[in-house]
Regions:
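Divalent-cation
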Residues: 1-36
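Minor-groove-contacting beta-hairpin "wing" of winged helix-turn-helix DNA-binding domains
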Residues: 396-403
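Active-site helix-to-loop segments that bind/position phosphate- or nucleotide-bearing substrates
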Residues: 23, 39-230, 238, 243, ...
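DNA major-groove recognition helix of helix-turn-helix
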Residues: 383
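Key DNA-contact positions within bacterial/archaeal DNA-binding proteins
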Residues: 377
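Flexible, glycine-/charge-rich segments associated with ATP-binding catalytic modules
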Residues: 143-144, 254-341
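The alpha-helix within a helix-turn-helix
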Residues: 369
Length: 406
């Protein structure tokens, strides 16, 4: 186009600048000859390099307008679903969508409605989709099928030469390594230090601050835009001055369109639906502007979205500038109760208890104490204070319930 070719004067010398715009994802790979695996090249800074077969396959996958997470995985069935994970999701779904007819469906039918199980009438085939297995599957089948993908959360707020992280969530044999569990484990840790507004009736959404929404959007964006058929790590790093979210797969859209908002080309639209149905993620294309607005409100540096075309990954960095006055306010708030509309320390902990119960109605007091970093006796005092939290039943059938305030 004409705007991509123009003269430019440098040190009194006129040169002609020819800008080669990035090809649309639906047109990639652009190649020479008849074989894309032999004729595809990409520019890495100072030169053009032959694309690897993995890179070409990734570009071909990205041509699919319907995303790739609806792919039926042969030989994978409902036996590969971790029912405990699925039922935790259904508990949250039921809480958010009380009158939804899907609540009465059997697990397999419910999963089909979400896009996690699919029938292919033409091929007369059926089975779990990529979205279904990755979101709710057992750890071993997931690692067998997606052996080049990892999940990793690290808190590096107080590291030293011999301490590389303060907290970590990764494959360690203590949990079923699916995406829903990863979100469940990481989100409370990610937002643990953020203040909450003084509104207790809206457990899931109304008590969100712009920062809570931004962190959630960053986490969800990392998942719905990840290329799970490639190689890499879903990585979240929490530091004192920043949060970093990394996913495998390069950007499908130019950065300027992403920053502008209103455009969404998720690689995993079925996962996007699954998360949106429980209150995670808003209108398509609005996620990144939500993050930008939250950071602008705090007058923090603009979020940085960086693409590494060598490692084939994208990293979103959210920098947070420390403010001594803000720290002083938090200290005063903890000692004296609510201040400027934020929750007191105990009310904040009760809100976190409610989140834990919604995730897992059978959560134990010991698990509550471990997550909140307090003693079991302190947990019991909080439970005694929270009149809307009740324990029903006994033995294996016992579980927590939350009574909505009138």
């Amino acid at each position: 186009m004409d705007e991509n070719v123009y003269p430019l004067a440098i040190d009194g010398v006129q040169i002609v600048v020819i800008e080669v715009p990035r090809a649309d994802y639906s047109m990639r790979p652009v190649y020479i000859g008849e074989n894309p695996f032999k004729g595809s090249y990409k520019r890495n800074h100072e030169g053009d390099y032959h694309c690897t077969q993995a890179e070409v396959r990734a570009m071909i996958r990205d041509e699919n307008e319907g995303g790739n997470d609806g792919l039926i995985l042969e030989e994978y069935t409902m036996d590969d679903i971790d029912l405990e994970t699925l039922h935790r999701y259904r508990n949250r779904f039921r809480f958010v969508n009380e009158d939804n007819a899907w609540n009465d469906l059997a697990d397999k039918d419910f999963l089909e409605m979400l896009g996690g199980y699919r029938y292919d009438r033409q091929k007369k085939d059926e089975g779990l989709t990529m979205a279904g297995l990755l979101m709710f599957g057992k750890g071993l089948p997931i690692r067998d099928k997606f052996d080049m993908i990892n999940m990793d959360y690290r808190e590096e707020s107080d590291v030293s030469f011999d301490v590389r992280w303060n907290d970590r969530v990764t494959y360690d044999g203590t949990w079923e390594n699916n995406l829903f569990n990863f979100i469940q484990k990481v989100m409370p840790k990610l937002t643990a230090d953020l203040p909450r507004p003084f509104r207790m009736e809206g457990i899931l959404r109304e008590d969100d601050t712009p920062l809570h929404k931004a962190c959630r959007e960053a986490m969800i964006n990392m998942i719905i835009h990840a290329d799970f058929q490639g190689e890499g790590t879903l990585k979240v790093i929490k530091r004192l001055d920043r949060l970093e979210f990394t996913n495998p797969g390069i950007l499908k859209l130019p950065k300027e369109l992403i920053y502008k908002g209103g455009n969404s080309k998720a690689r995993n639209p079925r996962m996007q639906t699954m998360l949106r149905m429980i209150g995670y993620g808003d209108t398509a294309g609005s996620g990144f502007p939500t993050i930008l607005a939250a950071w602008a409100e705090k007058k923090w540096p603009e979020p940085e979205l960086e693409e590494d075309t060598i490692l084939n990954q994208v990293t979103l960095t959210l920098k947070m500038i420390s403010d001594d006055a803000d720290k002083s306010q938090k200290t005063s708030q903890s000692a004296n109760g609510t201040l400027d509309g934020t929750l007191s320390h105990s009310e904040d902990q009760i809100a976190k208890l409610k989140e834990l119960i919604i995730w897992n109605p059978k959560v134990t007091r010991k698990q509550m104490a471990s997550t909140l970093g307090i003693s079991e006796r302190s947990v019991q005092r909080l439970l005694n204070t929270a009149e809307e939290i009740h324990f029903t039943g006994g033995g294996r059938n016992g579980h927590w319930e939350i009574t909505k305030k009138e």
